[in-house]
Amino acid sequence: GSRGFKPRAADERVGYFVTNYTDLGKFDWADTSQRLINRWHIEKADPKLSMSPPKEPIVYYIDHTVPIRYRRYVKQGIEYWNEAFREIGIDGAIQVQYQDKTTGANMDKDPEDVRYNFIRWISNDIATAIGPSRVNPMTGEILDADVVLTDGWIRVFTYRWEDLLSNLATEGMSPETMGWLDANPKWDPRLRLAPPSRREQILVERAQQRAHDSHSGHGVNHDSSMMIGENRFDGLGGRASQVNGMCEAATGKALDLAMMRMSLSMVRLLETAAEMGDDPEMSEEMLEMIRKQLAENPALRDMIPAEQLAMLEKAVDEDEADDAEDDGEEVAVKKKDEGDMIDGVPEWFVGPMLAELVAHEVGHTIGLRHNFKGSSAHSLEEINSEEMKGVKPWSTSVMDYNGINIRMPGSGETQGDYSVIGIGEYDQWAIEYGYGSGDLKEILSRSADPLLAYGTDEDAFGPDPRTRRYDLSENPLDYAKNQMELVKKIRAGLINDFVQDGDSWSRARRGYSITLSTQMQSLSMMGNWVGSAYVSRSKKGDPDSKAPIEVVPVERQRAALQFVIDNAFEDEAYGITPELLAHATVDKWWDNYSSISSDSAFQIHDRVMGMQASALTMLLNPQTVSRVYDYEMFVPADEDALTVAELLNTVNESVWSELKDGGKGTYTLRKPMISSLRRNLQREHLDRLIDMSMDNGGFNSASMAVKTIASMDLRDLKKTIDGSLKSGSLDGYTKAHLQEASVRIEKALDADYIYNAEDMAGGGGMTIIFGQEGKDRP
């Protein structure tokens, strides 16, 4: 290590990787574990100066493999951190040099040499970025660090969207939940969202994994990875010095970039409308662009405020009238200058996104851990305002997996920055603690400031919904609604706008799959808010600090619950049309085995059922239900709170809403009372309700409450179903569905005692019904 380096103690209020050891010279258990933050030896060349260059800067070399078109954004992302070091009086703490094959500059430096810190670039089809480091295990001093970037997140259309769906569906689930899903695979989104041909293989792999892990399927248990990068918790446990073993920031960027590619024309039109103000004067080039986009995608009209739409259409109509009066002389129309395109994406979009990604990974190399609360500081109205746009980052930390900001009408007055444009308040504070020379206790005492909130990887499966990957805004419900509006508009233009002449129709299926991923991301994001509580890391005595656990206001939980219901359970949420299904196909190539095994026709029922089943799991899994049950006691009895009964009843009423009118009306097999998608949902929900009515111990302390409420709901549901069956106007599909549901409920309620109920996952135990033996559980 460096001469004169002084180790610095770690503190849970600020996120650094740590080097830890056990001091057996201490006899107080709280003192035996010693933790030091991982940091570079950076100090002023002249301590007497308020602003001084460093004695020895951190130098990063941009590898010659980084494409020239991206190099300036890579450099920009690295240098973002100099702002934080200037705040503590060190100017130029980080320096950047290019390695260039043409000029020979720095080509004598080997990226594998530990004396040099490199930003490396790899071309592949995987969205990856990582910032590992080498640390002195005695002191926590960082000795060497590198960043590895791939361009896979830019090459987004080769992504396996099925895999991403299951990852998004289980985002935020705890080790206990993942272990429970392992024992109850029919509830498991990872299985339900997988292609049917792969499900048996997944179960076999899961069984092998259970032999090694206490909470199978959750990465926090994988301490023994042979190589870092196998799961998201690599580098954190089972080692003296933590490192960034895996980072998924680029994975979110892949989905964001895919959505941007699909919505590019829409975004341009919305920006044009927003920038018009009271001045309808536009160039010929602009008018031609607007005319073309409105003709190709009429759904765009619904997205523009009425006053601005009227101005746009008036300007286009007047221009067309002028053309009609022309003597026949053709007017050459020059395409609007939209700036340079890089790999099919506007430079003004992908450039800042890359700079943010680089800043995130460089943050890891200077010791910082993830902070998933960074994006929760500001509302969408603030983010999409002139006061913030281009002036300050809308996230307090580049160490978050920040979502992308594509503004839809009603989400602010103007389109704000799409990406985070620099380090935030938390980042500056973290550098002040790790590298500054001020009073460390005073620095840490500011932790209760909302702009300095911190939550990291192990918090992301806890009860705090703000510690969330890929979300955005102080109220993520607004962001989720914004994303679903974007999804609807993109789906409306899939056939006529996204798939161009000469394109394969497989683009329609890929495009639709991308929108499903964004939909799942929004559902999972809001599912985390049901049964949630804010968690604070502040300590007693910190100014303005709150209780460490604060139940999320019931209004927010109910709004989140309703969002999941509206956007997962209703047919309209999926934007399915006969035209879409007729065109959503696949290409058949032997170099892409997944396409060879895929059906040319989209298996829409299976895909939607996977989405709906996953949403039910988000709301009704034991961890969520138990938290709702526990949090009832956190709230005084004279105050409103979400209850287990309300949660189950709300889901029940929404899933079976068709029964409210008792089957009145006229129905046919082609226009049934209950659609095919909703029949699948209702059968799935009935399975869950029966499971919950037969206590298998999975719901812990809430088991008896869940059992009794679920049994009551089953009795009420049977009465409603039987009443609807008396209607003589039911179609054949609905009648058969309801008859089967009624019989299943009756058999379930007849069960007086379940033998071996706690082992239902083993294929279903024998059910001993009073007066009946040997009947299989329904």
Protein language model regions, located:
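Active-site recognition of the HExxH zinc-binding catalytic motif
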Residues: 76-82, 140, 356-371
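Conserved catalytic/binding loops enriched for acidic/polar residues
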Residues: 223, 242-349, 374-778
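Zn2+-dependent metallopeptidase catalytic core
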Residues: 65-93
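Short conserved micro-motifs at the rims of enzyme active sites and ligand-binding pockets
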Residues: 72, 131, 156-161, 408-415
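Auxiliary tRNA-acceptor-end handling modules of aminoacyl-tRNA synthetases
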Residues: 1-66, 84, 88, 99-325, ...
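Active-site alpha-helix of zinc metalloproteases
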Residues: 348-356
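Short, glycine/acidic-rich hinge or "gate" loops at secondary-structure transitions
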Residues: 87-102, 370-381
